[in-house]
Amino acid sequence: MLIWEQSGLEKVMDELEIMNSNPFYNELFYGKGKVEPKDIMEELLDIKPPRFRYVVKEYGKNAAIIEYLLHNPKDGKPWLGFLMVAKACQNQGLAKKLYTECENELRKMKHPVLRLGILTGNAPAFSFWSRMGFREIEIKENEGKKIHIFEKQF
């Protein structure tokens, strides 16, 4: 059973556990294999509607982090800002299940599209999101990192 718990500063250690189970991503994004509480705290300080972030628990264990933005002020579109599954929970269909729940909610709200960004070098993410029906629409640079913008129309 999946429980979505709204994230915030009180969830730093839960997020840290999930993040540090994925050193590949941390290396790409942060330039180091392990993140520290302050790295996560910086992310969490900016979370306010229409941006939402959750720690997802499965059978009481930290299983994933998911973040979405219902209305990006830059393009007016909803964005999936972050989805990370704890290493121990990967390859079990959890990412697909979480994404599908998000897509279903967006459909109910009559959003016709969803966007997300993938860092250059994140081959597993390219593969996963392509399988979910997303297509690359452009490449941008943010803070010195190339980000591939993907979009899916519903």
Where are these regions (language model features)?
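Acetyl-CoA-dependent GNAT
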Residues: 2-88, 99-101, 105, 140-141, ...
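A generic structural signal for beta-strand entry/edge sites
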Residues: 75-77, 113, 145-147
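Conserved glycine-rich acetyl-CoA-binding loop
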Residues: 80-82, 86-100, 109, 120-127, ...
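Conserved GNAT acetyl-CoA-binding A-motif
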Residues: 106-118
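Conserved beta-strand-loop-alpha-helix junction that forms the acyl-donor binding cleft
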Residues: 116-126, 141-147
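Conserved acetyl-CoA-binding loop of GNAT-fold acetyltransferases
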Residues: 130-138
